[in-house]
Amino acid sequence: MSIDRTQPLLPVTQVQPRETSDIAQQTRKPSAQSKTPVSGTEVKLSDAQAKLMQPGSQDINVERVETLKQAIRSGQLTMDTGKIADALLKNVADDLKSS
């Protein structure tokens, strides 16, 4: 390998010609497009799954959510950061014990 035989760098505005070996490789590759039509998939949910997909409010305490929204809007919501940190640390410790 000789330093004298390297190709000079060209500015970004100029386009370098492709190597003929690159063009030959591209013509040999099979096309990614398929000529066969793609069929759709039909999904049938069971009654239990369909019920779970429906919005419900049984697991949400709507009154508590509204109280929290009002406290946030008025700037009166206070958070016990120590309690949050303790719960987070307990959660991490439990995860480390189980693994």
Curated annotation (Swiss-Prot):
NCBIfam families according to UniProt: FlgM_jcvi
Keywords: Bacterial flagellum biogenesis, Repressor, Transcription, Transcription regulation
Keyword Lyase included in the entry's annotation: no
Gene: flgM
Biased amino acid composition, Polar residues: 13-39
Disordered as annotated region, ranges: 1-42
Function: Responsible for the coupling of flagellin expression to flagellar assembly by preventing expression of the flagellin genes when a component of the middle class of proteins is defective. It negatively regulates flagellar genes by inhibiting the activity of FliA by directly binding to FliA.
Protein name per UniProt: Negative regulator of flagellin synthesis
Family: Belongs to the FlgM family.
UniProt key word Transferase: no
Residues in the signal sequence: none
Gene Ontology BP, a term: bacterial-type flagellum organization
